[in-house]
Design a protein with these regions (language model features):
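PLP-dependent amino-acid enzyme catalytic core
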Residues: 1-287
């Protein structure tokens, strides 16, 4: 992030017609298509006659970087009848604490969980939400400065209240995630990954009577086959591809062709860069 924001590096790369970008949810190009999920889900509920046009629907979203759920906020601002957006966290529950108290504290114990895409302590897209709620570049800049210097910041009570009008929250432990994977498969025949299981568990606690709740499934279970196998009570293989095959055999579900094909692909990128060298490596690129 420091390299992205370094104007000197940007200027030097611009001389070579190079511009740095990121493929994660910091990139607006990642957020825009995610907005479509919410409209598509609402349309499916209408088609199935589960709701009438105009009925509000809640969404529970597993998230660490606050990108996918922010897309839901944009869908709401665009006019989709969204009730609450429930932020589902794993044991790295910094967002749950913030949405409950208004204080964001990144200086805390970090947990490596079975839902690694949510193992985040500094949630990048929350900055965007804070801008929309406060309407103040200066105030948000102050929050980010405090976060960088002290590891925390606190929003005003009225800001927290405004956020809580749209957002709910909850978190799941590792044991609860494993239990949810097993329960959903045994009770519903639905095979979910670890991240989706986080949201299922939180959704069950946060669902309001009479309001439909949509859980956003954010990954294939075959992307995390060892964790899913263990949750279902099977011995996990150390090799992900063997675990993928074992999961297919145990559940009679088929892995996505794109994932299964990776075993036969040639590895194209193997460079591991020390964080201290990122700027130098970026400047070494040629157009």
């Amino acid at each position: 992030k420091k390299v992205f924001g370094d104007k000197d590096i940007a200027a030097k790369l611009a001389e070579r017609n190079i511009r740095l970008s990121s493929a994660n949810s910091i990139n607006w190009g990642r957020l825009v298509p995610q907005i479509v999920y919410y409209f598509a889900a609402y349309a499916q509920l209408l088609k199935a006659e589960k709701i009438a046009f105009g009925d509000k629907v809640d969404f529970c979203v597993p998230t660490g970087n606050f990108g996918d759920i922010l897309a839901g906020y944009y869908a709401k601002r665009m006019g989709l009848p969204v009730g609450r957006l429930v932020c589902a966290s794993n044991e790295n529950n910094v967002l749950t604490d913030f949405l409950t108290t208004g204080t964001y504290t990144a200086k805390r114990e970090f947990f490596k969980t079975t839902s690694p895409s949510m193992d985040i302590l500094v949630s990048s897209n929350l900055e965007r939400l804070l801008y929309h709620v406060t309407g103040s570049d200066a105030e948000v800049a102050g929050f980010m400065k405090s976060l960088a210097e002290t590891g925390s910041y606190t929003v005003r009570p009225e800001t927290l209240a405004a956020i809580q009008e749209s957002f709910g929250c909850g978190w799941s432990s590792e044991a609860e995630v494993a239990g949810e994977i097993k329960a959903r498969y045994e009770q519903d025949g639905y095979l979910c990954d670890t991240h989706t299981a986080v949201a299922f568990h939180v959704a069950a606690r946060e669902k309001q009577a009479g309001v439909p709740m949509v859980v956003l499934s954010t990954a294939s279970p075959f992307k995390f086959p060892r964790s899913v196998l263990e949750a279902l009570g099977h011995t996990a293989h150390e090799n992900d591809f063997e675990a993928m095959q074992a999961l297919e055999a145990a559940t009679h579900h088929t892995a996505p062709a794109s994932l299964a094909a990776l075993r036969r692909k040639t590895e194209r990128f193997d460079m591991v860069i020390d964080p201290a060298r990122i700027a130098d490596v970026a400047l070494s690129y040629q157009s």
